């Protein structure tokens, strides 16, 4: 029944955590760009973060070409700037992840190893002169907590709306809540079936 609940939550939106025209959106774990396309149609400016070049070349670039306000960022989103070793699942477009986050099931699948540049969202904002971030969506296969740790300045200064998947690691909800509130105690957080939504009123 979990998949039904996911559908009921909508496309990474819930309550006050919703896309609005003119929003600057960070789509972390853009994959094929489905959420990026939705945000684009709302009139948002989208930065689509995707770590795997094959996914960008075969899928995400096509989505971006059909929507003029999507900019692709070929980075893994992390808590420091470094190079990460990734496993790209050859038979599953949505299961690629940093090697030290792999589980046994993923480890047994056909995969290609590659080195991927990682960046923090705070560093990306600084390097690109981005004046605000209105919405952050994150589905990055267990690295969500690292993303949040690398976005502390964004959470404090911009109070971005957050839509974050919580089903990758058992303690995700607790860890995310602690990181978010430590960065900005004004956040109001709602936990649903497989996602966490947060905003500052």
Regions found by a protein language model. Name each.
Residues 1-201:
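Phosphate/nucleotide-binding beta-alpha loop and adjacent structural elements of enzyme active sites
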């Amino acid at each position: 029944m979990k998949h039904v609940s996911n559908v009921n939550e909508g496309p990474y939106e819930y309550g006050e955590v919703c896309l609005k025209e003119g929003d600057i959106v960070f789509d972390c774990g853009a994959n094929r760009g489905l959420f990026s396309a939705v945000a684009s149609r709302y009139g948002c400016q989208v930065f689509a973060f995707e770590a795997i070049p094959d996914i960008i070349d075969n899928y995400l670039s096509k989505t971006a070409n059909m929507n003029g306000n999507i900019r692709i960022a070929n980075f893994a989103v992390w808590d420091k700037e470094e190079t990460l070793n990734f496993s790209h699942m050859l038979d599953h477009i949505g299961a690629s992840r940093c090697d030290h986050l792999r589980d046994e099931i993923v480890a047994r699948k056909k995969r290609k190893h590659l080195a991927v540049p990682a960046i923090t969202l705070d560093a990306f904002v600084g390097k690109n002169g981005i004046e605000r971030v209105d919405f952050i969506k994150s589905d990055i296969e267990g690295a969500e907590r690292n993303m949040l740790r690398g976005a502390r300045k964004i959470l404090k200064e911009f109070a971005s709306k957050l839509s974050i998947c919580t089903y990758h690691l058992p303690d995700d909800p607790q860890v995310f809540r602690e990181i978010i509130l430590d960065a900005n105690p004004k956040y109001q957080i709602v936990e649903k079936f497989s996602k966490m939504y947060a905003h500052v009123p």
